[in-house]
Amino acid sequence: VTAAAKTPSGSIFAGSSDREDVDVYQDGEKTTIRVEDPTDAMIAVPVSGGEDSVYRINRRTTIIQNINVADKSAGAVLRVGLGVGTITPGAQGMALATDTIGKQFGVYLTNDVIRLHQTTPTTGAPWAIAWDDKRQQVWVATTDDNKIRRYQLGSGQGEELEAYNSIENTQSLVALPDGMILAASATGTDVQVITP
């Protein structure tokens, strides 16, 4: 298992980078869902008053796919630009995905089927991405120029609000409930704290 996600209802979804299936563990039972490509990363996103969303990505084929939680089946597949990097949960079933090669990030939603809601170009090559629930904004770390940028999502595409210098090779980014941003390097022991 290389990727797993737990829904608020307690179901566990698990995938592997060398198998074309996703295992679902619920109420002591295991169900296996067949998918077209292996899984590199997976997230679960809660939805108030609705069915939780589960998304997975495959970097080789640069795709994102939703997994239907209720009937435990594979959902639709969309391409993520030129080279998907990472995904992170957003608000109300939203998934955010970076397109590292295409220098953009996408906002995905799923009700009955996955949809690309909008894309936003980034100045550098994005890898890590985080949803700031306090501000309802997106934070993106770009590894080619060592910056962390904050975006406001708009009706068409996101707007860059500000940029911070970051530690080298930021590949992990987290927005805490109080609005503090934590960034971690993949090549060292450095951790950066941003308090906007």
Predicted regions and their residues:
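Structural signal for beta-propeller blades
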Residues: 20-23, 62-64, 103-105, 146-148, ...
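Structural recognition of the beta-propeller blade-terminating site
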Residues: 23-26, 66-68, 108-112, 142, ...
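Repeated scaffold domains used in trafficking and secretory/extracellular systems
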Residues: 1-9, 35-48, 82-92, 124-132, ...
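Intrinsically disordered, low-complexity segments enriched in Gly and acidic/Ser/Thr residues
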Residues: 94-167
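A short beta-strand motif characteristic of beta-propeller blades
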Residues: 1, 27-35, 71-79, 113-120, ...
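Conserved beta-strand positions in repeat-built beta-propeller and related beta-rich domains
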Residues: 6-8, 13-18, 47-60, 95-101, ...
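Blade-level signature of beta-propeller repeat domains, shared across WD40, Kelch, NHL, RCC1
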Residues: 168-196
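Aromatic-anchored, glycine/proline-accented short structural segments
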Residues: 59-113
